[in-house]
């Protein structure tokens, strides 16, 4: 699934100049919920102040910047891979797929995708991986903010559907509280069953049934 919008392309200085999108993900480590990715093409004529790695920003600041990015970027797209896709493909491949979906969801086709990290998804667009790119490239910073805020919103909705797990507090990460609630309430439909703590609970449940 991809969510996208864009403004009109205000044009770069020459037809030969690369149209660059930044790409980043959010949610590889959690035990529950989808993994998200975002792609952003910034408008060089409409700079956005304060872009940096989303992890270094407060929730309030991230949310404010996400609004600015969506309003001022030339094009942006948010995509995800479900828990089922994560369990079927593994988290690395699911993350790569979410990134590719995000890039493909852009209304303006980039000529170069700058990817945060050390791996690039397989896609038609030329791509370059940049380690710690979310701190070095503003378009990647913007993508990290959109991916993070979209995932946090999704986990808020999961908290409404499954309040016993306190997703609003830990966002699905394997905190002591989350593990305690997992042991108490069992595995929900939105947990990643291929992840070790979740798989161990499922294996224990099967073993207990056989006794």
Swiss-Prot record:
Swiss-Prot/TrEMBL keywords: Cytoplasm, Endonuclease, Hydrolase, Manganese, Metal-binding, Nuclease
Single biological process term from Gene Ontology: DNA replication, removal of RNA primer
The protein's name: Ribonuclease HII
Gene name of the record: rnhB
Matching InterPro entries: RNase_HII (IPR022898), RNase_HII/HIII (IPR001352), RNase_HII/HIII_dom (IPR024567), RNaseH-like_sf (IPR012337), RNaseH_sf (IPR036397)
GO CC field: cytoplasm; ribonuclease H2 complex
Binding site for a divalent metal cation: 24-25, 116
Superkingdom as given in the UniProt entry: Bacteria
Co-factor(s): Mn(2+); Mg(2+)
Keyword presence, Phosphoprotein: no
Entry-linked SUPFAM superfamilies: Ribonuclease H-like
């Amino acid at each position: 699934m991809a969510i996208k919008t864009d403004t009109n392309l205000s044009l770069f200085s020459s037809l030969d100049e690369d149209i660059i999108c930044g790409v980043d993900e959010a949610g590889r480590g959690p035990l529950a919920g989808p993994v998200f990715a975002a792609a952003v093409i910034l408008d060089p004529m409409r700079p956005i102040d304060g872009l940096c790695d989303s992890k270094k920003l407060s929730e309030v600041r991230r949310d404010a910047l996400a609004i600015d990015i969506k309003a001022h970027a030339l094009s942006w797209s948010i995509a995800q891979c479900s828990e089922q896709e994560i369990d079927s493909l593994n988290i690395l491949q699911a993350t790569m797929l979410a990134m590719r979906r995000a890039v493909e969801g852009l209304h303006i086709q980039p000529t170069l995708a700058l990817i945060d990290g050390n791996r690039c998804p397989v896609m038609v667009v030329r791509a370059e991986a940049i380690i710690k790119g979310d701190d070095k490239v503003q378009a990647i910073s913007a993508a990290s903010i959109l991916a993070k805020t979209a995932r946090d919103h999704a986990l808020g909705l999961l908290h409404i559907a499954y309040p016993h797990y306190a997703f609003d507090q830990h966002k699905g990460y394997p905190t002591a509280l989350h593990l305690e609630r997992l042991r108490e309430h069992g595995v929900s439909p939105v947990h990643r069953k291929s992840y070790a703590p979740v798989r161990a609970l499922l294996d224990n449940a099967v073993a207990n049934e056989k006794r």
